[in-house]
Amino acid sequence: MPSDIEIARAATLKPIAQVAEKLGIPDEALHNYGKHIAKIDHDFIASLEGKPEGKLVLVTAISPTPAGEGKTTTTVGLGDALNRIGKRAVMCLREPSLGPCFGMKGGAAGGGKAQVVPMEQINLHFTGDFHAITSAHSLAAALIDNHIYWANELNIDVRRIHWRRVVDMNDRALRAINQSLGGVANGFPREDGFDITVASEVMAVFCLAKNLADLEERLGRIVIAETRDRKPVTLADVKATGAMTVLLKDALQPNLVQTLEGNPALIHGGPFANIAHGCNSVIATRTGLRLADYTVTEAGFGADLGAEKFIDIKCRQTGLKPSAVVIVATIRALKMHGGVNKKDLQAENLDALEKGFANLERHVNNVRSFGLPVVVGVNHFFQDTDAEHARLKELCRDRLQVEAITCKHWAEGGAGAEALAQAVVKLAEGEQKPLTFAYETETKITDKIKAIATKLYGAADIQIESKAATKLAGFEKDGYGKLPVCMAKTQYSFSTDPTLMGAPSGHLVSVRDVRLSAGAGFVVVICGEIMTMPGLPKVPAADTIRLDANGQIDGLF
């Protein structure tokens, strides 16, 4: 089979206006970025307010492994399949970060015959949204230091500035820096550092805002520092929000592209799935729901992180509710959860599959605990055996009373996911239960953390280190105790130890630190080491990326 980039380049793309027609979007509502990408105008989106909404389908996954699960590929394949069976469907995805493209090979536009295109533009600069977010964040950083330089009327304590700088690149050298060196004219020297743009709270706010007015209000709530008497200082206090909103105005319009089969996809925003909620923008999701019968979206990492945050943060803030949930699993990944080494995955191993099934089992039960109907999409790999697929379907049927459907969208496009699409429609149009949450926001922050750890992770208890406990007490005192929590832990395990695969139970979830994201509207709970500025590998993908004699990019994918 050809590579992803070869498949994408061989595709004949429709003019973006034709793709927009499928959703009833007129030409005048499009801001074109070439022939195959467009932004959807704010005014058109505002005109959709009050329209009935279609069905929302959430795609999540088991705990990820190096063997790969193919969640984005399944999201695209399912969207194509829904269109094939006569449903007007749109996919809502996150934008890829630029930095990782030059670190580890590969993008985030699906794979095989289930891709969104134009692939290279999507994975690189796209429409410049991340540049706008980087600029807005950088403007805030400049205004903070400028305020301190010119008399510091807010009495900001330079030892307690929480606002770091950002760049959309993997660069470990910028994790910790000294700034304002070189003399009095350059300001007050202090320690600082950079995060990657997707870790910025501006990105999280961007993806949770309902409109421009809500965006500006949320930006104003962001706490960027403390005064010398330990009072919070916000972006509104340093008068940054108006100019930041101006920089983000055009970026807040969702981006329209297409799949290889010419179906519409909205790709907008891309917050970290760890220290943020890991979902595409609310504006894109709402737009999709008001224009299509089915909107298929995904949440970052496994269901313990992505789906939980989608429900407890995004759905709680917006009133959204999925009508069906697809949990993506692979035979390969389940065998890894059952103890098989990656190099041995090609050999049939029913015992390891059954042992690793415990991971899928817990994810299914967790999603059901929110009152949501579930189907398992088994992403097919050519090394899989018929016996392994049959055994997995048997386990799902007998132990979970849930349907598991083998999907071949990577090799066959939408045609390979039609059975999954039919199952999703059956669930979405069937009986619906009220959405429930893992915790109530009225409870203390520590109780919310414990609820997630014990109910969803299988933990016996939580342990909050003294630094985190002190900060939590301060958040409660300052009036932030009713916010939801955003868990930041390893994606590879239900525990905080990435080597504990399967479905560990009885462990302790240790909380090392907490951070306030008042603009986004949650408290980040850090369990273990969380890296907000990645580094490049020993041999980065950038080493082999070039333009060939025909002006095409070589080595990116």
Curated annotation (Swiss-Prot):
It catalyses: (6S)-5,6,7,8-tetrahydrofolate + formate + ATP = (6R)-10-formyltetrahydrofolate + ADP + phosphate. Keywords: ATP-binding, Ligase, Nucleotide-binding, One-carbon metabolism. Gene3D superfamilies: Domain 2, N(10)-formyltetrahydrofolate synthetase, Formyltetrahydrofolate synthetase, domain 3, P-loop containing nucleotide triphosphate hydrolases. One of its GO terms (biological process) is tetrahydrofolate interconversion. Its EC number is 6.3.4.3. ATP binds at T65, P66, A67, G68, E69, G70, K71, T72. One of its GO terms (molecular function) is formate-tetrahydrofolate ligase activity. InterPro entries: Formate_THF_ligase, Formate_THF_ligase_CS, P-loop_NTPase. It comes from the Bacteria. Pathway: One-carbon metabolism; tetrahydrofolate interconversion. Belongs to the formate--tetrahydrofolate ligase family. This is Formate--tetrahydrofolate ligase.
